[in-house]
């Protein structure tokens, strides 16, 4: 894939997102099971991390290419594929805004679950996803929803309150969680509005440890939270941020045995 100057590369190579992804495996497998993937399908998984959805796609027999901007996550994904004996799955470093090394109309399914939504230039991202999808085939996105009361939207909201203002021209990733924005971006890429559909869905974060231990994992391994703590520490508000997140995780935990926290997202299906 092509080299990138995308500033998100440093963000997602920070920490070790595989530690957070490990809490999302069950939901990733469940989501993939809803997508009608069959043996031999060509699947592009954008912003794939270490394979939370790419691995179950390959286990269903699809030929899967996982693309992620973070070199460490690509390496972790390829290690998982090798360990699992999945010769039909490979991971490559790349940028969702520039898939120029991939041929037009070459994939039966393009999927991006909490991945491409974080890329800058959302119109460019939509255009590239449409370009590489075969006619009559699908794009599926999972996008966090702005101001949603569940976990991830609240983590991002709380973290933003402790962080410096974003640079001029910054487009928030959660704008992908607004249906009107999604329609605007894909229609600009040539898709008819009536070919775009939406559904609210749920991803759960499951961990054997306590909610406070899961907060510690986010603080240690999740780039956006790590940045928020660095900014909070510079202003003497590190303990305040810690307390807010621990309260959030504790209130949203649904089990007495470890931690299980559901988070609502917008599932987008685009039929080319």
Predicted regions, residues:
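A short acidic, Gly/Pro-enriched loop at the edge of an enzyme's catalytic core
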Residues: 97-109
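Conserved catalytic/acceptor-binding region of the Class I
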Residues: 123-124, 130, 138-209, 225
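Core SAM-dependent methyltransferase catalytic element
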Residues: 189-191, 264-272
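C-terminal helical/coil "lid" or tail adjacent to the Rossmann-like core of SAM-dependent
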Residues: 3, 9-13, 195-256
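Helix-to-beta-strand junctions that scaffold the AdoMet/dcAdoMet cofactor pocket
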Residues: 119-120, 133-135
